[in-house]
Amino acid sequence: TQRLDAIGAMVHPYFTISHAADMHSSGNVIRPGEKLELFRRHCVSSMERNDAIQFIRVRRESVVRDVLREFARFGRGNLEKRLIVMYEGESGVDAGGLTKDMFARFFHQIFAENVGMFVASEDGSSGTTGEIGLERGERTYLPSTKCELVSYMEALGKVLAKVVMDGHTIDAKFAPVLYKFLLLDTTTAAGMGSYGGGGGSSHGSGSSGDGSSTIGFSDLESFDGQLFAQLHDNILNRTITPEYADNLALDFEDLMPNGEHRVVTDANKIEYLNLRAQHILIGQRHRQLSAIRKGFHILPWNDNFRRFNEMDFRMLICGPSNIDAVTVIENIDFDHGDWKRSKTLEHVAKYLKSLEKEKDGLRKFLKFVTGSPGIPAMGLKKTEGQPAGPISF
């Protein structure tokens, strides 16, 4: 082993990185389950509910357009009412199932190429994003830079607000950085529209001080894994000499005022990578993302997202990434009905365990019996927005 000199000690991670500060800025001081439980209590006790009913009528073949048109005219008062869905030309009565079905169809179709609202990179995630739980090649979506339907983007934010308020579970394929943007404080989010905001000071993401991390180079990996790998190998892991920067035309053009006159060097390459990622992920689509954020924050969340990070937010609306038979069984009310002389419920439990061997088998079962492909992070509890409660037979 070699003894550190003074210069080496100044740059060594042991002396330059505070794991406690990193945990605090990323919202990881409190465990995810505790944060979600505290948030659920806020929704139950603090958020206003209206006894009135908000009807919407949609068509299955154009559910995205119809839902966005309805939510575009909604204000806070509309979102606080109980939502009742009616499908055009159908006589079904919504006891909660049609609402879940509508959300499932909506978030399945909104990412379709012909809708034109969202885009994904061709190669998707690199599959090494850890806690996010993305597979290699899995495509995640961000608003299209070509989409001028800003009012629809704002309406989408209201849809997400309703999903959160009522405790629904959706299968949303948003890039994690979208959740991160929704969690930023207003000043930071607005500032990212001008040349992507601050550059941060580390390989990962900087700290915004509001419980979430600002957007940086590491966030690019879950959206465009191939570009992330290229920048990682050709810039981060390279010694940037003047000749190398000149050959690759590496400068800060479009990333800061007069950026075309600032050359990338070995000293500022991390700042460059953070700004480049912010420009790709946020700057180019800032109007669309800001509209979603505006719609989402129409409800008074107060400080209840302050300690959330993007993984917490994703779990809040999508439920746990991994679902096993035990989790599903825990959300079944086996005391409902008279099954004392029947072994049916035993067979149900065995059947669910067999579905673990089939890809998405449990999610298909949940979609069939509940209308949603997942289980809420806090379980199937009867609430104002979820009148059905646990699964029962």
Show where each model-derived region lies.
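Extended low-complexity, proline/serine/acidic/glycine-rich cytosolic segments
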Residues: 1-138, 194-196, 200-209, 213-215, ...
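Intrinsic disorder
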Residues: 79, 89, 93-101, 146-150, ...
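Alpha-helical catalytic/interaction cores of small GTPase-regulatory modules
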Residues: 126-130, 135-179, 184-190, 358
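Intrinsically disordered, low-complexity regions enriched in proline, serine, glycine
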Residues: 96-97, 115-122, 143, 168-174, ...
